Amino acid sequence: FGLIYASNYINTFIFSYVQKASGTSLKGVDFTSSGTALGGVTSVLAMSVLAPFFEELMFRGTLFRNAEKCGQLTGIIMVGLTFGLWHGSYQQILYAAVMGMCACFMVAKTGSIFPSLILHFTMNTIGAIQSVALGSIDFDKFAAELEKGQITGTAPMIIIAVALLSFGLMIAGLVLFVKELRYHRDSFRLINFCPDVSQGKKIVIYLTAPVTILAFAGLIFITVRTALGLGLF
């Protein structure tokens, strides 16, 4: 959790700096719900149940199982990067890539996709709840009240609660990660199924495969067009 949430903050910082330095305004994907009860339920079900199930079968159950034959570390890195691009949003590239790598690591160590499915389900459920909470806020009204210094309603409490939840999970997760790394370093060892081939060469082979080139090109194309507000086509 710590690494995943930390990557989200880093991703936000990087692209905020890029926009400020370049004078551009990137368009993000709106993850908030419609604010209605039906919209909230639909958002939670889609994000916390359907998406994790489909994506874990596709990325960890299929893609990683094939990629790890070149070495578990190679598989973790490459499938993680692919997972980041798969989301088609600059807001989620680093966040999703790190989560994808963590999920692949769990599969590599346990031999099952169920731990990664639980991780994915948990992360998406938290995100869906945050989405529903933020979707209930009229941000135009909130911005106007903030400018006048006359803030009313529950918007401030909701925003603070969402921020504290994310920040708290990040700090707690990072502390536990450092503790685990310090006292159980051997548990982080990965299997190299092709010791005669260097790690760099494995990554190059993966990235230069025709299927990988086409997939990455398509995903990058979608991500860039979405960020520029041009739509998919």
Residue ranges and their predicted role:
Residues 39-224, 229:
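Transmembrane helix-loop-helix hairpins at the membrane interface
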Residues 1-57, 223-233:
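Juxtamembrane helix-loop-helix connectors linking adjacent transmembrane helices
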